[in-house]
Amino acid sequence: MLHIRCGDDILSRLDDAGLPGAKRRWAYPLCEGPVPEGLDGAAFRSLRAGFVAARCRLDTQTVLDDLTRQDKGLEQAIGQDEVVLWFEHDLFDQTVLIHLLDRLDRIAPGVPLSLICIDRHEGFERFVGLGDLDAGQLGALFGMRRPVQAWMVETARAALRAFRAPDPSSLVTIIRAGTPELPFLAAALKRHLQQLPWLRDGLSLTERRILEAVAADATTPSAIFRHVQNAEQARWQGDWFQFASMRDLASGPAPALHQTGDDWPKGVEFSSTGTGRALLAGQADWFRLNQRERWVGGIHLPAGAPVWRYAEEEGEPVLSVA
C-alpha cells in the first residue's frame, strides 16, 4: 500500500495511526504560475522549478531536485495493491488531485486507487484541512476511503486539460456543468479563474484582498497573510507565494503598497499608496499600470495585449483589451 499526500503535514501521523504502507509527498504548487499544455517530464519540472524558485526566493537547483524526487516517488505506485490519496477541498489540493489521478492512471494502470477528500470534520467550526486532524481522526478517515472509479479519472483528465489550456472556455464549461464525480473541483476551478486580473481594477482576488488587509491596518506580511486567509472560503495559498504577491504590489512604476524594510518576513511592513487607495476605490487598473507578464495555469497574460480577465457580474472570464 502507498499513501500520497500533497504535503508532509500528516505523513508522520499516518504512521502514528498504524496505517500500513509507504507514505509519499507530491506537492507541486500547480495553482501558482505557468502550467502550459504540451510540456511534461524534465521540461515541465525545469519550468516549474524556475518559477517556484523566483517567486519564493529559493535556489533553483534545490527546487528542481525536490520536484525530481517527488516525481520519482510516484513510481512506487507501480505494482501496489492500493494507492490511497489524501486530500481536502481547496484549490491547491484539487489541482494536485486532478494531476495525480491522470498521472497515476498512466504510470500505474490497473493499480487500485482510493480517495479521502473532505471539506469538513466533526468538532471544527471552520475546517481548514487534514493537517488539523490527529492520528486517531486520520485513522478513522482511512476506514471511510472510497475507490476511485474510471469516470472520476476521466473527469480529472478533462479538468486538467482545461486547466492547462491557453483559453479558459473549457474550464468555464466544466464549472457550469459541475463536477459531482469530484464534488469540490468546480468551486476550486472557479477560484482559480478569480486569480486572473478582474475587469474592474486589474487585480487578482488575492491582490485585492492584500490591499484590503493593509487598508484594515494589517501591516506585517504575517498579519496580512492571516487577514487574507480568513477571507478565503477555502484556504489554499501558502505564505511564501502570498509574500511574493505583496512584493509585486510594492513594485513597478506605480506601486500599490509602500514597503519598509527588507528582512522577510519579520522585518518588513507595508502601507497603502495613492495607487493602492485608487485601486480599492475602483479608480485605477493594476494590470494596465504595471504591464507585468503573468501566467494563471495555462492562460498566458502578456503585457500590452488583449488578455483574459475575470468579469464579476458574469462570474467568468472575458477577453479584454489589456
Residue ranges of predicted features:
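A structured, charge-rich N-terminal accessory region that forms the first stable segment of a protein
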Residues: 1-62
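Long, hydrophobic/aromatic-enriched structural stretches that serve as scaffold segments
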Residues: 56-106
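Short, conserved secondary-structure transition motifs
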Residues: 116-140
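A conserved mid-domain beta-alpha-beta active-site/ligand-binding segment of alpha/beta enzyme cores
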Residues: 135-215
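Short capping segments at the starts of secondary-structure elements
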Residues: 213-223
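A short acidic, leucine-rich amphipathic alpha-helix
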Residues: 223-229
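Charge-enriched amphipathic alpha-helical scaffolds
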Residues: 229-263, 267
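C-terminal engagement modules used by replication, chromatin/transcription, nuclear envelope/ESCRT
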Residues: 252-322
